[in-house]
């Protein structure tokens, strides 16, 4: 039994160390002027795991650069955007992987966060990979309905929770 537990811990540590979330492209809905952009950026700058922020105001997109080995909190990003009076149109992470084999319904623990890969084929991830967060509040209502239809067999997509975890985020490759 001890051998089995040790194997499980080593496997989990391997999964955790095979990834590094580097940055995110955050599309914000409702930005209409420079003051709106300033208010949003000011809120985002209060997040401790963000190292720096770039922006593309023509596309209402912020590039969030994360501190090395930071524990990323997607709900905090969402909360800060909403505190500024806006909503998220999309959140696309760029993460660096080393030989991480995934398939549909694969679960990845990164730091303290559980991610569930949906609508993906079996593939080995190497280098920088773009991952779209597809949970409610991180995509448009239309996209959420489309993903929800594809995810009918995954109750965690509807609730955002797994039986053995407080929160689970759902990702797809792009």
Could you say what each language-model-derived stretch is?
Residues 1-23:
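Bacterial Sec-dependent N-terminal signal peptides
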